[in-house]
């Protein structure tokens, strides 16, 4: 076991604070509309330029083990806020630094760290309640665009694109962000349910120019197992042929005699047909087939529920207005499912999302939810260089996350203003002087984001904060972009409540733990062994 080095008391806290300050000082220059960029060196490829707080925090690793502990604890504040709200990481870092700085001073003045923590926790609870009380629900597409624009650092085109995407696929819809191959940023919306399985044979193609299968008003056979035997499939094929409608078969696989017959049938101009593999694997495949059945008002043909393929009637098949099948994807547009049944299925998936502890399962459930509830939108971020595209993609990701958070819990004025107002309204009392001091730490720390935004814009922070607090209106604040005092909400300067709340809660949680630290243990760095000396002397009889 390697030897350990131990630091105690004031010495330990000072080293922690030094690490916190190094990380926070690198991150906080990015805060606000006039925040600066940070350039991050990469071991391969071009350096990365970003204004995203968590991206900067994740790159910082300090040489001194004790200082690094402080930096990593503060990095956790940014990461946790990013996981919960997807934005507000820089605000969380600034708040965390302010709470640690004030807390270390209080502990140095012989106050009880545990009582300080209790005071901090009580104050945070009161501030969060105040934020919820003042929150304004988002109703219009314009308000969604405003939130997205602020988080994208004032880029109105990004704000409008995200608002359009949310309008088209709904609040539950999946919106993904990808890097484009061109210089333009564009939005592509896939309506209906799409899954990543294409046609099993190119002979099914109806549009040879685009190599697509287009089926209008088809029946949809949803089968859980493999289809290889033709005899069991014949009754369904005959019934569909008599109706004159096309047929889409979704099954685990279609092979052998069954596939050959379907292809020959299509080539002879008999039945307009296509077959695709079922999406997903195992239990997830079963669930997705059920989703397709609900969406198209069909039934999953499965021997588990006692339905044999030879007994299937047309009433058991799903219906849709259109189906498009490419080499790699299948899209079902405007399924015939009952709205009430689809809503019940959506509620069931939402309940599963709440219960799951696996991030992977949650992501897959959200994908299923989106496919049922609305559709999928893809924002392709373009730019002239790879560095520009990556920087822009960071901003689009932040804007998208902030917008989702705003729809969920509502909005408050931006620019750190609600935290300033909450500090003024913080009237709770502690049970003893040390708890009072903990409440005071939060009261002072709440000013830090607004001060940092002003400082990054080259303004005198104390003057800006003073003028904002002189006005009694909750929505009055300072617009750093235009250097004007005004009603922030009417000008679209807003922040999602979820972002502000998560930033404060996570900052206080980690910072109060740092304050209560009394000892630190780290491994003693190993001394590098000196390289062996080169053997002396040259080769005999050789002159150089």
UniProtKB/Swiss-Prot annotation:
A Pfam family assignment: Cpn60_TCP1
rRNA processing recorded as keyword: no
Biological process according to GO: protein refolding
InterPro entries, per the entry: Chaperonin_Cpn60_CS, Cpn60/GroEL, Cpn60/GroEL/TCP-1, GroEL-like_apical_dom_sf, GROEL-like_equatorial_sf, TCP-1-like_intermed_sf
Keyword Chloroplast: no
Enzyme Commission code: 5.6.1.7
Subcellular location, record wording: Cytoplasm
SUPFAM superfamilies (alphabetical): GroEL apical domain-like, GroEL equatorial domain-like, GroEL-intermediate domain like
Keywords noted in UniProt: ATP-binding, Chaperone, Cytoplasm, Isomerase, Nucleotide-binding
Protein name from the UniProt record: Chaperonin GroEL
Gene: groEL
